Design a protein with these regions (language model features):
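Domain-scale activation on soluble regions of proteins
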Residues: 1-15, 29-33, 48-55
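Amphipathic alpha-helical "output/dimerization" segments
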Residues: 112, 130-147
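Solvent-exposed polar/charged
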Residues: 32-35, 74, 147
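Regulatory sensory and allosteric helical modules in signal-transduction proteins
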Residues: 7-8, 38, 44, 48-54, ...
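Sensory-domain boundary capping and coupling elements
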Residues: 69, 110-124
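Amphipathic alpha-helical coiled-coil segments that mediate homodimerization
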Residues: 22-30, 34, 41, 177-185, ...
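A short, aliphatic-rich beta-strand micro-motif
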Residues: 103-111
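Signal-transmission linkers at sensory-effector interfaces
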Residues: 1-20, 156-187
Length: 202
């Protein structure tokens, strides 16, 4: 269900935010570990691929149609293209024909609440293989990305809970004041007495 997937992504409030070192660090590590020129952490919404982190390229986003990672989110595990020139799906891709001239790609889906919302990927202008051990390492790095996203979600939920709790406390306080006013009016107490009890109730 792509609508549920996109909704999960939107609820993270991560799209169109500033670059962050905690994500950049993971992307840099991926590029270094697998000796690839490029690496990225990207998210796929309805129409685009948006980059939270990108190593050695200056892009904010691409269309979903041209995004390698849009294919990655259709797979439960690491998606690998050893040589794009040998792939009917990718040999005509604009990022293969033109800069950065992608020949090799490997991406692992980023999963939040059961939905594959994006990918951590490495890619290079030279074709190459990708071993099962390397798949496992890329998967481990991707889990770090998910941990950061879950921490972000927890922070946001905590802030929302705090706001709701404050609103509830204010509402309860208002209810107490109303009860005091009603009680004093029913008992025909003087206005100064009513005001005094209101102040004490706040």
């Amino acid at each position: 269900d792509d609508k549920a997937r996109v909704k999960t992504l939107q609820c993270l409030n991560i799209l169109d935010t500033q670059r962050e070192e905690r994500f950049d660090r993971i992307a840099r590590l991926a590029a270094q570990l697998f000796q690839c020129e490029f690496a990225s952490i990207s998210f796929i919404d309805e129409k685009r691929q948006w980059f939270k982190s990108l190593v050695n390229l200056s892009l904010e986003q691409t269309t979903r149609e041209t995004a390698f990672c849009a294919h990655t989110i259709n797979h439960a595990s690491t998606f690998i293209v050893p040589d794009t020139h040998q792939s009917e799906t990718f040999k005509g891709n604009p990022f293969v024909i033109n800069a950065p001239h992608i020949r090799f790609y490997a991406g692992t889906p980023i999963v939040v609440n059961g939905h594959r919302i994006g990918a951590l990927c490495v890619f290079d202008p030279k074709p190459r293989t990708f071993s099962p051990q390397e798949e496992g390492q890329l998967n481990d790095l991707c889990r770090l990305v998910e941990s950061e996203l879950n921490r972000e979600e927890l922070t946001w939920l905590t802030a929302q809970l705090s706001q709701k709790q404050t609103a509830l406390e204010e509402n309860q306080k208002l209810t107490r004041v109303r009860s005091v006013i009603l009680e004093k009016v029913v008992n025909c107490e003087s206005l100064p007495s009513v005001l005094k009890h209101i102040v004490e109730s706040i």
